[in-house]
From Swiss-Prot:
SMART domains: DEXDc, HELICc
Higher taxonomy: Eukaryota, Viridiplantae, Streptophyta, Embryophyta, Tracheophyta
Residues that coordinate or bind ATP: 228-235
Protein name, entry field: ATP-dependent DNA helicase Q-like 1
Gene name, Swiss-Prot/TrEMBL: RECQL1
Placement of sequence motif DEAH box: 335-338
Main localisation: nucleus
Amino acid sequence: MKDQDLELEKVRLISLATKLGFDEDSAKKCLDRFVDLYGDDGRDFITVELCGDDFLAALADFEEGTEEWDDIQAIESEAQGNLAEMFDKSTNPSDNGFDTDDDDDDSRVEVHVIEDSPEPKKKPEIVELDSSSDLEDVETRFKVPRRSQTCSRSMDYSMEDSVSTISGRKPSVQISNKDHETPSYEELQALDDLEFANLVIFGNKVFRPLQHQACRASMERKDCFVLMPTGGGKSLCYQLPATLKAGVTIVISPLLSLIQDQIVALNLKFGIPATFLNSQQTSSQAAAVLQELRRDNPSCKLLYVTPEKIAGSSSFLETLRCLDRKGLLAGFVVDEAHCVSQWGHDFRPDYRELGCLKQNFPRVPVMALTATATESVCQDVLKSLRIPRAPVLKMSFDRINLKYEVIVKTKEPLKQLQELLRDRFKDQSGIVYCLSKSECVDVAKFLNEKCKVKTVYYHAGVPAKQRVDVQRKWQTGEVRIVCATIAFGMGIDKADVRFVIHNTLSKAVESYYQESGRAGRDGLQAQCICLYQKKDFSRVVCMLRNGQGRNMDRFKSAMAQAKKMQQYCELKTECRRQMLLEYFGESFDRMICKSSLNPCDNCERS
C-alpha cells in the first residue's frame, strides 16, 4: 500500500472511531500504535473493511480502566451459596417440611427450599370453593393435594380430552376477573382440564395468550418453541404441565440466580417440589439428588440444571436414561433458548451442546422458550436442538401500551434527567438503567442529593442483603426509582412500572427490548425512553470488549448488534416501533403506530 493510500485509510479509521463516539486524539494515538504493530508487511491490511473491528477493539483496550463494568458473576456466586444453604437445610430431617410415601426408608432425601429473604412470608394464594361438593369435584378431576398437605408425593394427573393440533383449542371460559370473587360451581364445571388445573394450582382464572397452546403441546408430548415478550408468562407454559405429568421435568437455565428465584417461587408460593443440580455443588449434594431421581417415585416434579451439567456429566445422563426407562422423564425445557444460537445477543457455548437431548432421548418432548429471538436466531435454535419441525408459538412483540422515545442528551445530562423525572414522572415508579457501576451510583446520588428524589441503586457489586433490601423498597413503593445496571431484572415482576429510562443506550436491540419491557406489565400506558449521545457508544464498545474475554469473533458479533441499537437511537423520521418489530421478524404497518394511543416520538411528530 502506498503512503498516500495508507493516509487515506487512517483518515477513514479515525472517522469510524469518532463516528462511534471515541475521542479523536485518543483514536490517533491508538492508530499510530496499531500501524506500528502491523509493520510494513501488514500495511495492505490497514483498511476499515479488513481491520475496522480490530482497531475498535484496540481502542477500547487503550481507553480501558476508566469505568467499572458490571459482572453478574458476583450474583451467580452468591446464588450458588444460597442454593447450597437451601439444599443443606432441606436434607436436615429436623427441618424437613415434606412427608414421604416411604416413611420407613431413612435413605430417602426430600428436597425443598428455606426462604432466605427478610420479607415476611406471604400466605399462598388459595382458591376458595363454594361448598364441600365443589371441593369433592376438584378432587375427583385432579388428585391435587391441598396446600396444607405434603407436596412431595408424585402428582400424576390425567388429561380427559386431547386435541390433535396445538392451535385447535376451544375459547377460554369467561370467569369473573374480580380478584377476590370466588368462581361459581357452574364456572368450575365449564373449565377444561388445563384451565381447571391453572385455577386450582396457580390461582389463575384465565390463561394469557398462547399459554394454553403451549401447555397442551407439552401434555401431548410434542416439541415446541415458545416466543413470548417479557412478562408474557413463559414459566407457566412448562410449570403447569410439569405438575400434571408423571415423572420429572428437566429445566435447563443459564443462571443460578434465575434458578434460585424459580425454586423459591415453586416451593414456597405454589407448594410444587423442585430442586436443582449444577457443577458447583459438592459431590455429596449432587449424589443426594441423583439418588432421589433413581427412585421409583422421585419426590421432585421439576429439576433445574445449568447447561454444563447436561453436556459434561455422564453420571447425570445415565440418571436421565434410568428415568426414561421407567417412563418418568416427563420432558426437557430449554429456558432462555436464545443462548443456544451463536447469533444471539447472549450466546453460551454450553447451550450449543443441548442438541444431545434429542439425540439421546428422541421420544422425550423438548420445549424451548425465550423472550427475544430474531428469525435467524429462532431457526438456529430449532436446528441446534434437533427439533427443526417443532411448531413455533409466537406472540406479537408489539407492546401496544408502551411509548418509545429517544431524547438527545444536552450538555448537562443529569439536570436533563432531573427535569424529565420532575415534569413527566412525578410520584411514579420506574427504572433508570445505567451502563456501568459508577454511572449507576453517580446518578442515584445526584437524584437523592440534588433533586431530593428518593432513589436507590442496584448492581452486582452491592452486597447481597443490600440488594434484597433495595428490591424490597422498590417493589413495595417505599422508593419510586431504582438506578440499575443489567444485573437488575432477573426475577423482577413489578406491574406498575410507568417508565424505563436508559441513561445510556443498551448494548443490543434484544437487551433494550427486554429491559424496556419491564415497564407497563399491568397493561396501562408506560414510557420507554433512551437518552442518547454519540460519544456514549464508545463506552458500549469498551464494555463489550471487556465482557467478551478478548474473543474477537464474539466481539465482532456483539459490535454488529450494538450498531443496530445505535441505528435505533439515530432514527430521525422512521417509526421506532416498526424498527423494533421488524428486527424480530414481525411485519408492521407504521400507520398503526401513528393512529395508536401510544405513538413513538417520530410518529407523533410526523
